[in-house]
Amino acid sequence: MSQIKPSRLSSSAEIRGARQLDVLQRHKLAEPQQDWLAEEVPVALVYNGISHVVMMATPKDLAAFALGFSLSEGIISSPQDIYAIEMTPGCNGIEVNIELSSRRFAGLKERRRAMAGRTGCGVCGIEQLDDIFRPITPLPFTQAFNLEHLDTALAQLKQVQPVGQLTGCTHAAAWINPEGELLGGCEDVGRHVALDKLLGIRAKQPWQQGAVLVSSRASYEMVQKTAMCGAEILFAVSAATTLAVEVAERCNLTLVGFSKPGRATVYTHPQRIK
């Protein structure tokens, strides 16, 4: 399997997922200048030779994305269910070829859907309403987080957004320990993809105690993906939706929105929060 490592800040010359284009600024319309833009390409996840989903994504940390998506969608239950991940760049996008165990591939074929996604859209292509909600085993109550450490984590979030710092165009997802230290994270133009990348990285790291921190709002699917991978606490910089709160309540996930310096709104299961 491709090696998966936590993202860290790099110099602009080393950054993948962004490139420079000529642009015109309002105050200098006659003088083209170069500016950084985030890359967005179609990424096809292909399981044992069968294309399962196409998502628009930033072309970095794609092995982590493949693993995290497979876990958060319930296609696999552990990284050991994937034997190999290989990237195949093409003219129109990137194929991520994933070799599944025969048992997991048989299960996937039963529920396979063809889904062409817009940026981070996780519902596109689902054929029936009942397919939106996946059964999630209620989470245990083994985690705790002191909000005094939240500001520390927020101050570090841009460390995993080198493309975002250049372009202002990416979402971030990070794993923070109970002391507020950012252990690693990912970025992407799509918030769901950024989260899947993080969940893929976490699956290969000894990160148990802590929480997920995302730079976006908390939709139902962000909650569902987090819970599917066993994380008990989700901090979102923006608000949560009503459906996200309902799903979090049902699966015992602690959901916190408006996670900003000096501020936090706890929606569900506050017993984990100090």
Curated annotation (Swiss-Prot):
A single GO molecular function term of this UniProt record: sulfur carrier activity
Active site per database record: 121
Localization (cell): Cytoplasm
Gene Ontology cellular-component terms listed: cytoplasm
Domain of life assignment: Bacteria
Residues reported to bind Mo-bis(molybdopterin guanine dinucleotide): 258-263
BP-aspect Gene Ontology terms: Mo-molybdopterin cofactor biosynthetic process
Pfam families: FdhD-NarQ
SUPFAM superfamilies according to UniProt: Cytidine deaminase-like
Keyword terms of this UniProt record: Cytoplasm, Molybdenum cofactor biosynthesis
InterPro entries listed in its UniProt record: Cytidine_deaminase-like, FdhD
PANTHER family according to UniProt: FORMATE DEHYDROGENASE, SULFUR CARRIER PROTEIN FDHD
Summary of the function given for this chain in its UniProt record: Required for formate dehydrogenase (FDH) activity. Acts as a sulfur carrier protein that transfers sulfur from IscS to the molybdenum cofactor prior to its insertion into FDH.
Similarity comment: Belongs to the FdhD family.
Name listed for the protein in its UniProt record: Sulfur carrier protein FdhD
Annotated organism of origin: Yersinia pseudotuberculosis serotype IB (strain PB1/+)
